[in-house]
Amino acid sequence: MKPPIFFLIMSTVISGTLIVMTSSHWMLTWIGFEMNMLAIIPILMKKFNPRSMEASTKYFLTQATASMLLMMGIIINLLYSGQWTVPNNPNPMASILMTTALAMKLGLAPFHFWVPEVTQGIPLSSGMILLTWQKIAPLSVLYQISPTINPNLLLPMATLSVLIGGWGGLNQTQLRKILAYSSIAHMGWMTAILLYNPTMMILNLTIYIIMTLTTFMLFMLNSTTTTLSLSQTWNKMPLITSLITMLMLSLGGLPPLSGFMPKWMIIQELTKNEMIIMPTFLAITALLNLYFYMRLTYATALTMFPSTNNMKMKWQFESTKKMTFLPPLIITSTMLLPLTPMISILD
């Protein structure tokens, strides 16, 4: 893709998200979602092959269905209240339709089916945008309408997302699918706390985006997409590979790394709201995520995969990619836990 075209498409993606975030009119919100969806498809198809075309088609069909449900909810709300304002008190049926549509756009269970397949079929750079930037717009709308969301609908989806995000990643060897299931689980954590402390959801989203962004950038720097290729990168980039193992443990939520902080704060907040069963279930299912990340770290750092004598060793020229923001991102992704008291005071 030529740089001017890529710049134009990325500008449209960013503009669509900003329109959704700043709009207080339902029609403008819907238009922002459509701009975002139509502009991201050429980025998903950056490598023109059958797999990326299939992934883009799945993404388009899912997002178009979600947009249709969202518009149905908006129209029902308009007929009920006569207003286009976003944070008004919608009709219960409209609220259910809107929540379902936004859950489909986010990839919450049971509407998670598209996330692993789409992420696996696209390049690492496109997957990075899909699992980070594309989560901002739906979560911003959920944040605005959080007082009117039915908890009997959202909380079961949140707990199911955390369970499926951990369970689905157990049997994976493809790094993109592992990150996709991890994204489903993180979305579950965010929507679980949304109804009780929306500000904490923003904190969780920020930390998730930083960690996922850094992990994808290191995978791109290392040119690795599978567990096998990751285990063979010690000879060419030992420092980057060791940083990847640290980041994966942070994504799994292992203390004392940054990924543990949002989980700790969410469990604490849910307990303050006199909820016992849900934070217990979330903590137990989070161990599934931690298990497959620890298994991946163990396979990368402490074992050698079986190989034949004529198997080619991975090598490459010195990387020419300029990633200026990588060092501060790595520090933030791994060493944020000591700042928890200060962040909790601000919250």
Curated annotation (Swiss-Prot):
The chain crosses the membrane at residues 3-23, 25-45, 59-79, 96-116, 122-142, 149-169, 178-198, 201-221, 237-257, 274-294, 325-345. It comes from the Eukaryota. Its EC number is 7.1.1.2. It is a multi-pass membrane protein. One of its GO terms (molecular function) is NADH dehydrogenase (ubiquinone) activity. Core subunit of the mitochondrial membrane respiratory chain NADH dehydrogenase (Complex I) which catalyzes electron transfer from NADH through the respiratory chain, using ubiquinone as an electron acceptor. Essential for the catalytic activity and assembly of complex I. Belongs to the complex I subunit 2 family. This is NADH-ubiquinone oxidoreductase chain 2. It comes from Genetta servalina (Servaline genet). The gene is MT-ND2.
